[in-house]
Structure formats: structure tokens, C-alpha cells
């Protein structure tokens, strides 16, 4: 198994538990250049809010989309958009990524923005 398959295997366990609870989830995906966050409803079929470093308004604020500063900006933005969509509490789905670095920075910024998890 390669690195990606191992990560997805870890993610499957978390997603199964979140799906069982039917809770709204905040999912994170990261690449070397960008970080993405989505708030997905309990059924897993609708995206309620999304934010990423690919967006023009976010990209204009940052020189680089692949660092902790960018993750903090995306975390605050996803919290604002989720609250605007009426979401207060979420389950954090780190998609098998370690809770460290950019993933941790995004999560902490989302908490500061008012999301509860």
C-alpha cells in the first residue's frame, strides 16, 4: 500500500463513524500548494459551505497557499460561511491527515471563528 492508500484507509474509519452519527462534518483536504475545507450535511450529499486557497479573494491576500497562514485564513473563512449557512457544531474530518501543521491551524482557526467541535 502506498502513502495515499494508507491515508484513505485511516479516513474511512472516521467517515464511517461520522456517517453513523449523521452529524454535519467539516472535511479538510490538503495538497502541497493549497488547502480546501468543506462543511457537508449529515447525509453526505450536500455541501453547505466551502472555502479554499484557490479562491481569488483568498489568493489575493496570501503569497503562498500551502502554509499555516493560508490554513488559518481558510479556517476563519469556513467558520464564517458555515455560520451563515446556520451550522454551529460540526464533526472534524481530517481525511486521514495528521492533526498537525496546516490541518491543526485550520481547525484552530475554525474554532476561533465560532464552530464547535
UniProtKB/Swiss-Prot annotation:
Keywords associated with the record: Ribonucleoprotein, Ribosomal protein, RNA-binding, rRNA-binding
Give the GO terms filed under biological process for this record: translation
Q: Which InterPro entries match?
A: Ribosomal_uL18_bac-type, Ribosomal_uL18_bac/euk
Record keyword RNA-binding present: yes
Q: Which Pfam families match?
A: Ribosomal_L18p
Question: Listed GO molecular functions?
Answer: 5S rRNA binding; structural constituent of ribosome
User: What GO terms fall under cellular component here?
Assistant: cytosolic large ribosomal subunit
UniProt family annotation: Belongs to the universal ribosomal protein uL18 family.
Q: Briefly state the protein's biological role.
A: This is one of the proteins that bind and probably mediate the attachment of the 5S RNA into the large ribosomal subunit, where it forms part of the central protuberance.
Question: What PANTHER family would the database entry show?
Answer: 39S RIBOSOMAL PROTEIN L18, MITOCHONDRIAL (PTHR12899), LARGE RIBOSOMAL SUBUNIT PROTEIN UL18M (PTHR12899:SF3)
Q: Kindly give the HAMAP family that the UniProt entry links to this protein.
A: Ribosomal_uL18_B
Q: How does it assemble?
A: Part of the 50S ribosomal subunit; part of the 5S rRNA/L5/L18/L25 subcomplex. Contacts the 5S and 23S rRNAs.
Identify this protein by name.
Answer: Large ribosomal subunit protein uL18
